[in-house]
Amino acid sequence: MAIVGLGTDIVEIERIQAHVARAGDKLAKRVLTEAELAIYTGHSQPSRYLAKRFAAKEAAAKALGTGIGRGVSFQHIHIGNNEDGAPTIHFTEGALARLQQLKATVGHISIADEKSYAIATVIIESQ
């Protein structure tokens, strides 16, 4: 296996909170998949959840080498959790096409947050 992509992103949680206060759920609806949006709406800290997902998807898009745009949207990247609570990443549509173009087989993700920031790193491996 070889690493074919690496991406990292950091988000100031307060910036997301301010955006939500100003524009409501507009950003959440643009960034989150339907399943993620369902979690967001019931989450005890929705702005923190959104900041972590935003950072994760930006990191994934950087690892794909496209960024958001150029055929890859936030909606093409789903961030979930396995049964132990560890984050998982799933690619669809344009993100999946780019993953296949890279001949990649797996994506690894790490997400962390502290008082003011959310950070995510994504590694993409090929066979």
Curated annotation (Swiss-Prot):
Q: Where in the cell is it found?
A: Cytoplasm
State a GO cellular component annotated for this protein: cytoplasm
A GO BP entry is: fatty acid biosynthetic process
The residues that hold Mg(2+) are D9, E58
Reply yes or no: does the keyword Ubl conjugation apply: no
What does the record give as EC number? Answer: 2.7.8.7
What this protein needs as a cofactor is:
Mg(2+)
Q: Does the keyword Metal-binding apply?
A: yes
Which reaction equation describes what this protein catalyses?
apo-[ACP] + CoA = holo-[ACP] + adenosine 3',5'-bisphosphate + H(+)
The source's superkingdom equals: Bacteria
What are this entry's molecular-function GO terms? holo-[acyl-carrier-protein] synthase activity; magnesium ion binding
What keywords does the record list, in alphabetical order? Cytoplasm, Fatty acid biosynthesis, Fatty acid metabolism, Lipid biosynthesis, Lipid metabolism, Magnesium, Metal-binding, Transferase
**Free-text function comment from the UniProt entry:** Transfers the 4'-phosphopantetheine moiety from coenzyme A to a Ser of acyl-carrier-protein.
UniProt cross-references to NCBIfam families, sorted A to Z: acpS (TIGR00516), pantethn_trn (TIGR00556)
Family designation:
Belongs to the P-Pant transferase superfamily. AcpS family.
This chain's protein is named Holo-[acyl-carrier-protein] synthase
The source organism is Shewanella baltica (strain OS223)
